[in-house]
Amino acid sequence: MEFAGNKSVITPEAVFIIGTYDENGVPNAMNAAWAMQSDMNEITVMLSKHKTTENFEKTGAFTVAFGTADTVLISDYFGVETGKKVNKIEKAGCHVHKSAHVNAPIIE
């Protein structure tokens, strides 16, 4: 095995799209690159302050989807735009429906 050198980041990583509703029921989503499966039925997501994390703190619920090659543009957009200034779901042209399991959106 060849020495890869000192690297501070290991890539590529899975991109998680975290979906939440705000206190008015408006859906929001963010791109969370710092996430991983930490147990058989558990994920760990490291988040700083974002509109999505504020929503989660208020509602206690979120959904997780995976960014894929088919959703790369929308996934990237969810990571570069702030939900504090615009409705990212609406601006991206996405449709959502409420999860049957938690009070959070499923992005279609």
Language model features: what each stretch is:
Residues 1-30, 36-108:
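Active-site-proximal mixed secondary-structure blocks
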